From Swiss-Prot:
Record-linked Pfam families: Ribosomal_L16
Key word Protein biosynthesis present: no
Keywords from the named record: Ribonucleoprotein, Ribosomal protein, RNA-binding, rRNA-binding, tRNA-binding
GO biological process, one term: translation
Protein known as: Large ribosomal subunit protein uL16
Taxonomic source organism: Nostoc sp. (strain PCC 7120 / SAG 25.82 / UTEX 2576)
Subunit structure: Part of the 50S ribosomal subunit.
Family designation: Belongs to the universal ribosomal protein uL16 family.
Function: Binds 23S rRNA and is also seen to make contacts with the A and possibly P site tRNAs.
Amino acid sequence: MLSPRRTKFRKQQRGRMGGLAHRGSTLNFGDFALQAQEPAWITSRQIEASRRAMTRYIRRGGKIWIRIFPDKPVTMRPAETRMGSGKGNPEFWVAVVKPGRILFEIAGVTEEIAREAMRLAAYKLPIKTKFIVRSQVVEEQE
């Protein structure tokens, strides 16, 4: 599972998820992509489950790029702990995803295979997603 090797601070504030993704919202590497339509925290476990689902489906052919990285620690208190006595310990890592963000990209496979692989990956994620094709993106920009 993905997590940072080291961070400057162990704990982070939760923050807000307003607005759209401007960075990471264009197809850069592959021919097909999965784009987020809702804001959410996506855990490293969900990213790994999606990656496994895609790699199992496309087998040897093709290449997959993961365009998000879980760099935010989420802390939790132990069960049945009284209020106070500080912030809990980091339990897992999440990637902050805003609408428009490209989550995964695939190249080297047909559109049907890519579409099905992305569908399997999308099942593992807690958000609505959209399948994007490079040729359609180029046509819209012209």
